[in-house]
Amino acid sequence: MDSVNQRDRISSLPDVVLVMILSFLSFKDNVKTSILSKRWRNICYEAKNISFKESEYVDISVFDYVSKRVSFVRYMLNWVSRVPIKVIESFEICLGFPVGFEVEIKSLIEFSISRQVKKLVLDFSSPFWDNTWDGLRNDDFVIELPALIYGLQTLESLTIYACMFDPSRFTNVGLRTLSIGWFRLEKIESLLSKFPLLESLSIISCYLDEVKLAGQIRVRELIIDNCIIPTMYCLLNLPNIEIFKYSGNVIVFDFQKVNMILLKEVYLDFFIEHENDEPTYSPKEAGDILSHLLNDLRSSRTLTVCSYLLEVISECNDPVDMLRDVQAQHLVLETLMHPNEFTGMRLLLDHCPNLETLTFQLLCLKPFPVRLQYIDSHTLWLENISSRCLRRTLKILVVRGFCNSWNEFYLLNYLVLPEHGFALERVELYLPPLQEMPRQWAYHGAAMLQKTSNRVQVILHSA
């Protein structure tokens, strides 16, 4: 009897305490508790964070995919009909291309409004779409934002993907986080004027007629991801910016103001340029543009750059003098480990005098080498060169996706040599999922690095 009481101690707690415990679980795990007992079955409906994600309930590869979607929508309606509480914190619907479910979706959104929701996520983008606006038509969007949303004063965070709305109607003065996806925006600045307290803005896969933020902008975080910008120009006045992330084609950025003290993180990804039939700019032009961009954002404490930037940054006119010192303490290089990137890597290292952590994020797996091909690291990394950060500040080297290709090995071997990495203390190697032979090759590479510099600790993390 004592053991039974011990096992059921949690169930003996008051409902209000159980609801607090459930609030620390994901919504999906919350739902699972309903099978524990009749009491738990009712308590789970008191969760203040409600999330319905099609991907967690419907497998798009099954033959009865359509009927599964119908069941999923019925499940959502049945759930909200049982919610007894009058106020919820967050409400999320992720249902791709909801043709035929317009009435049901409207009912679900109105439920969240009636519960004075603070965080609302409406994602109707299809998993079959590309991650860009290109090729989409107006009839791809079937859900229109209900009128009551525009004036909902409890709303603090709003995400709307592939949903029709009128930017001029918003009066949510308390909104602090806004994320818009798969939409055409004519003027971002006029939209932001509706939200005087906005701190975080994300624009995903949108068509942007004009990107101009020149007024009094409070935004601390700005994310622009895979958007079409026909002007190829972006004017930004961001005196409070702390986080800036951009993914897409190379465009000209004109930063009117950036607070050097506040800027914490910058992420720059132009990898899409590798996939374009014709590059947006020549390597020299792209190198000039991206050098100016790095100079404008040089005060960031964490800097992440892509393989394309590494390739073209050295193509600009007089790259050594054009690029100013970057104040980053953590540099993340998303790389294919191609020799074309190495000059750009060295250039950035030469201009990061305060660097403490260097991370290589490998973008694709390197197969086990079927024939040995010696790559002379002294050809790729000039002899007797040691950057200021290698001599003074760089303590941690991280490689994610380590496979020990020859390009990886000779680069890392150069960095851990005692005569180069004076301050280096630790190397962390993270393996991706590998078959037995490639995994053994990676183990061998880690052991060789450890032998190269006994004073540096080499740590290998298996997948």
Curated annotation (Swiss-Prot):
Residues 7-55 form the F-box domain. The lineage of its organism: Eukaryota, Viridiplantae, Streptophyta, Embryophyta, Tracheophyta. InterPro entries: F-box-like_dom_sf (IPR036047), F-box_AtFBL13-like (IPR053781), F-box_dom (IPR001810), FBL13/AtMIF1-like (IPR050232), LRR_dom_sf (IPR032675). It comes from the Eukaryota. Gene3D superfamilies: 1.20.1280.50, Ribonuclease Inhibitor. This is Putative F-box protein At3g29830. It comes from Arabidopsis thaliana (Mouse-ear cress). It holds the Pfam family F-box.
